[in-house]
């Protein structure tokens, strides 16, 4: 099912704001971008600066970008501003509707964006080796329950790390199929804490992407700012002796070429 949007929100094409692109593996955006139709009121969405940097680095105009857990549409907005075609998928109809609304603006040169209600574990509607770039930001287990248990298959309902990673592996396998060889898949994922102890969610997810055949190109540390829960958790952290997690991992994976000799990069593979 495709999420429908109405007429354009703006009469004139929007201009692409210029931002300084990143060149290190530590990214920090104290002020999240608010240009075009970007909004910060969808809990858990990522800063548009992340999408801008990844799309600029790993794709070209006219390429097709896929976000299989599109949320409020950050990836699709930036894809449109940068003249990339894009497909966004979300299992939550409310999120799909938000994304469809977010891309209701004119831009030149023209490109095509589409939002579908669907499950990232089934990308059979896409051809194999058809996508130029994947960029996504999945739920961090059940830290934020986007559908409150009402949508079957919603990853944000899963509280078990092994179960969550099993489902992520299914998604990773689908992404590996539809991504073109020698192209890139970027995923922003953070960690969590249980019983005052660190749970390495990000690295567990990373291992599942390596398992299906991806190789690790980059591990970018993204500093978190303006977290609404920081003030609430600070006294408890000081009292109980643990540190607040204030970073996320932006993993960039590459799909190897057919028959590619991976011996030189074997330590970036599933070993």
Q: Where is each model-derived feature located?
A:
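Class I S-adenosyl-L-methionine-dependent methyltransferase catalytic core
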Residues: 1-271
